[in-house]
């Protein structure tokens, strides 16, 4: 293993062999490895000049230093129990040794709707594993493992490179300077994930606390647990494209003053507009043209798509039973998981000030937009067109 690590050390300019061994762990189940941050080879604009970790998460994490990200995760863990008026269990930190022989201090905990988080603190490295497929309340397969509790956990929303990641910062929590960061996306069946849990384990996790989510259309936690994860997974795109899309997801949310920033573990008011900023789930020809024109990706198809033809995403012969999906951009639609804040923002975007809509459940939303577009008429003209 150390012989394999030497070329990797030279290529990535790592400080010690231990760093290479930790980065190379579980390479068979990794989708890609991206070195990001300032002065990093993969840190092109806009990834290089943003402190946000380009991964779809409920709240933004930090790519420039491990401490804000660890704080966000622990803060979200504590807030989750506080919102349910529960006493958080004490964190159990253990001194362990990884398969490569390096010692670390580690812990793990479940943060709904993010999933299972594992933290490893090495002498000169900080490693965080995030498996967002683990959710014993909303991502359980009711038909799997009923007769055999020892059977492997079968979930509806499987592990995916879009949201299952391993993050490595070169440095410890007390370093004052910015740290190089590696973002390793993990495929289904990765270590430290859902494949290591049985149905009995999931049952124990589900019974460890009350149901942590609210009602459909009212709770952003539930919206992220179901809509966001199902809306971003199974994307046949390269690592850099996934990173740029995740960055757009966070940038929209973080620009709203009521939403959390880096180092804050509370939930935003909703995710509908962030998903709109994220763009099409499987990519599109229009988005590829824009990324090429802004020189974020190269001109070749392999710079944008990844294994698209291998998995038959674009069928050559139309088949109504297996239609696949189109390369081109489609209209964005809101779902039943959209929160009232989401609907209000959409009304403000689409309707002139004073116009309103009434939803199926009888709630009325009136546009409060202060900007009047040139191609729009007054409210009276808008109502006259409707009557006509």
Curated annotation (Swiss-Prot):
Protein name, as recorded: Protein Bel-2
Miscellaneous remark of the record: Bel-2 expression is low.
InterPro entries: Foamy_BEL (IPR004956)
Gene Ontology biological process terms, A to Z: positive regulation of DNA-templated transcription; viral process
Family: Belongs to the spumavirus protein Bel-2 family.
